[in-house]
Curated annotation (Swiss-Prot):
The protein's name: Rubredoxin-2
Source lineage: Bacteria, Pseudomonadati, Pseudomonadota, Gammaproteobacteria, Pseudomonadales
Induction conditions: Constitutively expressed.
Highest taxon of source: Bacteria
One cellular-component annotation, GO: cytoplasm
SUPFAM superfamilies: Rubredoxin-like (SSF57802)
Main location: cytoplasm
Sequence positions that bind Fe cation: 6, 9, 39, 42
General function of this protein: Involved in the hydrocarbon hydroxylating system, which transfers electrons from NADH to rubredoxin reductase and then through rubredoxin to alkane 1 monooxygenase.
GO process terms (BP): alkane catabolic process
Pfam family name, one: Rubredoxin
Protein's organism: Pseudomonas aeruginosa (strain ATCC 15692 / DSM 22644 / CIP 104116 / JCM 14847 / LMG 12228 / 1C / PRS 101 / PAO1)
Designated gene of the protein: rubA2
């Protein structure tokens, strides 16, 4: 599972955790999130997220 970070506000989407409060179950891959989904913290689109490595 990977993690994706919003380059605008720093919000992190963790594929392992999903976002149940947004209707995205745990284990949902980034590719499977709808294209019109937006960052829950700042409202930017998926284009403004980058995959990150957390050490």
């Amino acid at each position: 599972m990977r993690k994706w970070q919003c380059v605008v506000c720093g919000f992190i989407y963790d594929e392992a955790l999903g976002l149940p409060e947004e209707g995205i179950p745990a284990g949902t891959r980034w590719e499977d999130i709808p294209a019109d989904w937006v960052c829950p913290d700042c409202g930017v689109g998926k284009i403004d997220f980058e995959m990150i490595e957390i050490a």
